[in-house]
From Swiss-Prot:
Quaternary state and interactors: Part of the 50S ribosomal subunit; part of the 5S rRNA/L5/L18/L25 subcomplex. Contacts the 5S rRNA and the P site tRNA. Forms a bridge to the 30S subunit in the 70S ribosome.
InterPro entries tied to this protein: Ribosomal_uL5 (IPR002132), Ribosomal_uL5_bac-type (IPR020930), Ribosomal_uL5_C (IPR031309), Ribosomal_uL5_dom_sf (IPR022803), Ribosomal_uL5_N (IPR031310)
UniProt-recorded name of the protein: Large ribosomal subunit protein uL5
Family membership: Belongs to the universal ribosomal protein uL5 family.
Domain of life: Bacteria
MF terms in GO: RNA binding; rRNA binding; structural constituent of ribosome; tRNA binding
The keyword Membrane belongs to this UniProt entry's keyword annotation: no
Keywords: Ribonucleoprotein, Ribosomal protein, RNA-binding, rRNA-binding, tRNA-binding
Amino acid sequence: MSNTASLKKEYADRIAPALKSQFQYSSTMQVPVLKKIVINQGLGMAVADKKIIEVAINEMTAITGQKAVATISRKDIANFKLRKKMPIGVMVTLRRERMYEFLEKLVRVALPRIRDFKGIESKFDGKGNYTLGIQEQIIFPEINIDSITRILGMNITFVTSAETDEEGYALLKEFGLPFKNAKKD
Protein backbone atom coordinates (compact mmCIF):
# COMPACT_ATOMS: atom_id res chain seq x y z
CA MET A 1 0.00 0.00 0.00
CA SER A 2 2.91 2.35 0.58
CA ASN A 3 3.79 2.19 -3.13
CA THR A 4 0.29 3.31 -4.06
CA ALA A 5 0.38 6.20 -1.63
CA SER A 6 3.83 7.22 -2.86
CA LEU A 7 2.78 7.10 -6.53
CA LYS A 8 -0.34 9.19 -5.85
CA LYS A 9 1.72 11.55 -3.73
CA GLU A 10 4.35 11.78 -6.47
CA TYR A 11 1.61 12.71 -8.97
CA ALA A 12 0.23 15.42 -6.68
CA ASP A 13 3.62 16.77 -5.54
CA ARG A 14 5.81 16.49 -8.63
CA ILE A 15 4.06 15.33 -11.81
CA ALA A 16 0.96 17.58 -11.82
CA PRO A 17 2.89 20.83 -11.12
CA ALA A 18 5.48 19.90 -13.78
CA LEU A 19 2.77 19.28 -16.39
CA LYS A 20 0.93 22.45 -15.37
CA SER A 21 4.01 24.57 -15.99
CA GLN A 22 5.04 22.66 -19.14
CA PHE A 23 1.68 23.16 -20.88
CA GLN A 24 0.81 26.49 -19.18
CA TYR A 25 -2.54 25.39 -17.78
CA SER A 26 -4.47 28.08 -15.92
CA SER A 27 -6.10 25.57 -13.54
CA THR A 28 -4.90 22.37 -11.92
CA MET A 29 -8.11 20.71 -13.14
CA GLN A 30 -6.77 20.97 -16.71
CA VAL A 31 -3.75 18.79 -15.88
CA PRO A 32 -4.19 15.33 -17.44
CA VAL A 33 -4.72 12.38 -15.10
CA LEU A 34 -4.57 8.62 -15.58
CA LYS A 35 -8.23 7.52 -15.52
CA LYS A 36 -7.92 3.74 -15.89
CA ILE A 37 -5.80 0.90 -17.18
CA VAL A 38 -7.52 -1.81 -19.25
CA ILE A 39 -5.75 -5.15 -19.72
CA ASN A 40 -7.13 -7.37 -22.49
CA GLN A 41 -6.24 -10.81 -23.84
CA GLY A 42 -7.79 -12.07 -27.07
CA LEU A 43 -7.90 -15.87 -27.00
CA GLY A 44 -9.15 -17.10 -30.35
CA MET A 45 -7.85 -20.61 -29.63
CA ALA A 46 -10.39 -20.83 -26.78
CA VAL A 47 -13.01 -21.83 -29.37
CA ALA A 48 -11.44 -25.30 -29.45
CA ASP A 49 -10.41 -25.59 -25.78
CA LYS A 50 -12.58 -24.07 -23.03
CA LYS A 51 -9.95 -24.55 -20.30
CA ILE A 52 -7.76 -21.85 -21.87
CA ILE A 53 -10.25 -19.20 -20.67
CA GLU A 54 -10.16 -20.50 -17.07
CA VAL A 55 -6.34 -20.52 -17.04
CA ALA A 56 -6.22 -17.01 -18.56
CA ILE A 57 -8.71 -15.69 -15.98
CA ASN A 58 -6.62 -17.12 -13.12
CA GLU A 59 -3.37 -15.69 -14.55
CA MET A 60 -4.89 -12.24 -15.19
CA THR A 61 -6.40 -12.20 -11.69
CA ALA A 62 -2.99 -13.05 -10.20
CA ILE A 63 -1.24 -10.35 -12.25
CA THR A 64 -3.70 -7.53 -11.54
CA GLY A 65 -5.09 -8.40 -8.11
CA GLN A 66 -8.63 -8.01 -9.44
CA LYS A 67 -11.01 -10.67 -10.80
CA ALA A 68 -10.83 -10.91 -14.58
CA VAL A 69 -13.94 -11.38 -16.71
CA ALA A 70 -14.34 -13.39 -19.90
CA THR A 71 -15.27 -11.43 -23.02
CA ILE A 72 -17.82 -13.07 -25.27
CA SER A 73 -18.33 -13.04 -29.03
CA ARG A 74 -21.09 -10.86 -30.41
CA LYS A 75 -21.89 -12.80 -33.56
CA ASP A 76 -21.41 -16.10 -35.39
CA ILE A 77 -18.44 -16.51 -37.74
CA ALA A 78 -18.56 -19.91 -39.43
CA ASN A 79 -15.02 -19.76 -40.87
CA PHE A 80 -13.58 -19.50 -37.34
CA LYS A 81 -16.06 -22.04 -35.88
CA LEU A 82 -17.24 -19.23 -33.63
CA ARG A 83 -20.75 -19.03 -32.21
CA LYS A 84 -22.49 -16.09 -30.59
CA LYS A 85 -21.84 -15.68 -26.83
CA MET A 86 -18.78 -17.97 -26.77
CA PRO A 87 -15.94 -16.80 -24.48
CA ILE A 88 -13.04 -15.59 -26.66
CA GLY A 89 -10.98 -13.38 -24.36
CA VAL A 90 -10.28 -12.03 -20.90
CA MET A 91 -10.19 -8.45 -19.63
CA VAL A 92 -9.71 -6.38 -16.48
CA THR A 93 -10.32 -2.66 -15.91
CA LEU A 94 -8.20 -1.17 -13.13
CA ARG A 95 -8.99 2.12 -11.42
CA ARG A 96 -7.75 4.00 -8.32
CA GLU A 97 -5.36 2.12 -5.99
CA ARG A 98 -5.11 -1.08 -8.03
CA MET A 99 -4.34 0.98 -11.14
CA TYR A 100 -1.39 2.66 -9.43
CA GLU A 101 -0.18 -0.65 -7.96
CA PHE A 102 -0.26 -2.29 -11.40
CA LEU A 103 1.49 0.69 -13.03
CA GLU A 104 4.24 0.55 -10.41
CA LYS A 105 4.70 -3.21 -10.93
CA LEU A 106 4.68 -2.84 -14.72
CA VAL A 107 7.31 -0.08 -14.83
CA ARG A 108 9.61 -1.27 -12.05
CA VAL A 109 9.42 -5.07 -12.37
CA ALA A 110 7.72 -6.45 -15.50
CA LEU A 111 9.05 -4.29 -18.36
CA PRO A 112 12.71 -4.68 -17.34
CA ARG A 113 12.22 -8.48 -17.46
CA ILE A 114 11.46 -8.42 -21.21
CA ARG A 115 14.29 -9.98 -23.22
CA ASP A 116 16.34 -7.45 -25.24
CA PHE A 117 14.23 -4.59 -23.89
CA LYS A 118 15.11 -1.22 -25.43
CA GLY A 119 12.02 0.78 -24.51
CA ILE A 120 8.44 0.94 -25.73
CA GLU A 121 7.06 2.65 -28.84
CA SER A 122 5.59 6.11 -28.37
CA LYS A 123 2.54 5.82 -30.64
CA PHE A 124 -0.68 7.19 -29.18
CA ASP A 125 -4.27 7.04 -30.49
CA GLY A 126 -4.74 10.76 -31.22
CA LYS A 127 -6.67 11.43 -28.01
CA GLY A 128 -3.90 11.01 -25.43
CA ASN A 129 -4.46 7.29 -24.78
CA TYR A 130 -1.75 4.67 -25.17
CA THR A 131 -1.88 0.92 -25.82
CA LEU A 132 1.09 -1.31 -25.08
CA GLY A 133 1.33 -4.83 -26.49
CA ILE A 134 3.04 -7.46 -24.34
CA GLN A 135 4.15 -10.69 -26.08
CA GLU A 136 4.51 -12.93 -23.00
CA GLN A 137 2.69 -13.04 -19.68
CA ILE A 138 5.76 -14.57 -18.02
CA ILE A 139 7.36 -11.14 -17.45
CA PHE A 140 5.10 -10.69 -14.42
CA PRO A 141 6.50 -12.14 -11.18
CA GLU A 142 3.14 -13.70 -10.20
CA ILE A 143 3.31 -16.15 -13.11
CA ASN A 144 5.23 -19.37 -12.42
CA ILE A 145 7.09 -20.25 -15.63
CA ASP A 146 6.95 -23.98 -14.86
CA SER A 147 3.16 -24.06 -14.48
CA ILE A 148 2.11 -22.30 -17.71
CA THR A 149 0.87 -24.37 -20.63
CA ARG A 150 1.13 -21.74 -23.35
CA ILE A 151 2.62 -18.28 -23.74
CA LEU A 152 -0.09 -15.63 -24.10
CA GLY A 153 0.24 -11.95 -24.90
CA MET A 154 -1.92 -9.05 -23.79
CA ASN A 155 -2.79 -5.45 -24.59
CA ILE A 156 -2.49 -2.85 -21.85
CA THR A 157 -4.36 0.41 -22.53
CA PHE A 158 -3.68 3.55 -20.50
CA VAL A 159 -6.73 5.85 -20.64
CA THR A 160 -5.89 9.44 -19.74
CA SER A 161 -7.83 12.68 -19.57
CA ALA A 162 -5.25 14.28 -21.89
CA GLU A 163 -6.67 15.98 -24.97
CA THR A 164 -3.60 15.55 -27.19
CA ASP A 165 -0.99 12.85 -27.70
CA GLU A 166 1.73 15.23 -26.53
CA GLU A 167 0.00 15.71 -23.16
CA GLY A 168 -0.60 11.96 -22.77
CA TYR A 169 3.02 11.22 -23.65
CA ALA A 170 4.28 13.74 -21.08
CA LEU A 171 2.01 12.27 -18.38
CA LEU A 172 3.04 8.65 -18.97
CA LYS A 173 6.71 9.63 -19.33
CA GLU A 174 6.51 11.32 -15.90
CA PHE A 175 4.94 8.15 -14.45
CA GLY A 176 8.07 6.31 -15.58
CA LEU A 177 7.07 4.46 -18.75
CA PRO A 178 10.34 3.84 -20.64
CA PHE A 179 9.66 5.18 -24.15
CA LYS A 180 12.27 4.41 -26.83
CA ASN A 181 13.04 7.92 -27.99
CA ALA A 182 11.95 11.47 -27.35
CA LYS A 183 8.86 12.65 -29.20
CA LYS A 184 9.80 14.44 -32.42
CA ASP A 185 7.99 17.73 -32.92
